[in-house]
Amino acid sequence: MKKPAVILATAVLGSAAFAQQEIMTTTFNFDSDTPGQPPKGFEFGLTGKGKPGKWIVQAVDDAPSGKNVLVQTDGDTTDYRFPIAYTGPELKDLRLSVKCKPVAGKGDQGCGIVWRLKDANNYYITRANALEDNVHLYHTVNGRRVKFAGWNGKVASGVWHELAMEMVGNHIQVFFDGKKVIDDHDDTFKDAGKFGVWTKADSIIQFDDLTATRK
């Protein structure tokens, strides 16, 4: 049933682009994408060194929704290596969440989300690490990642988690499995940008239900 014209619609998409003037919330669940191929509507980049990352859709038995997930499958062990997959539209104030499952990685098992992204070297990032048992919040400026807030707590490998953030103005809140774990402020990036997902070094991570809501 159609909503009145003044109400912004909510959409659930495989990986398609969407009209920002009509949609307030969207979820990418990757179920309309072809397994073994990159998801439609996404761009890919690399912060740091090493291989750029290989992002493909996979069908898995335990996907949080549907059957498909997005996976970064290249286990290059370069330490300062951050593959990212991102999409639009550009948003400034938003809530961003993702379901993520750390699958493998001897050096890292980092599952992250990025927002207010200008390019592969400039964005906000929060990530949960199953090898370190923590959640950190950073800004990355000209390729240099700087942590300014964090939380220590159990991040289990091999199970699905939800990582989420909300940012309005310079106020940032980060949530892990429904619990607020970080509440801070930062003025590094003040304009709208794209959003997406992130990994580190040899992390093999599955992602599903990437959801962005304009605030």
Where are these regions (language model features)?
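Short, solvent-exposed beta-strand-to-loop segments that form ligand-recognition rims
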Residues: 152, 175-196
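Extracellular glycan-recognition surfaces and repeat-rich motifs
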Residues: 37-70, 78-80
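Short, aromatic/His-centered strand-loop micro-motif at the edge of beta-sheets
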Residues: 141-162
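Ligand-recognition surfaces built from glycine- and aromatic
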Residues: 22-25, 189-215
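Short tryptophan-centered beta-strand motifs in secreted/extracellular beta-sheet-rich domains
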Residues: 30, 96-98, 159-174
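Extracellular carbohydrate-recognition regions
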Residues: 20-48, 208
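Beta-strand-rich interaction surfaces with strong enrichment in secreted/lumenal proteins
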Residues: 82-89, 149-155, 196-197
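Secretory/extracellular carbohydrate-interaction modules
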Residues: 35, 72-136, 140
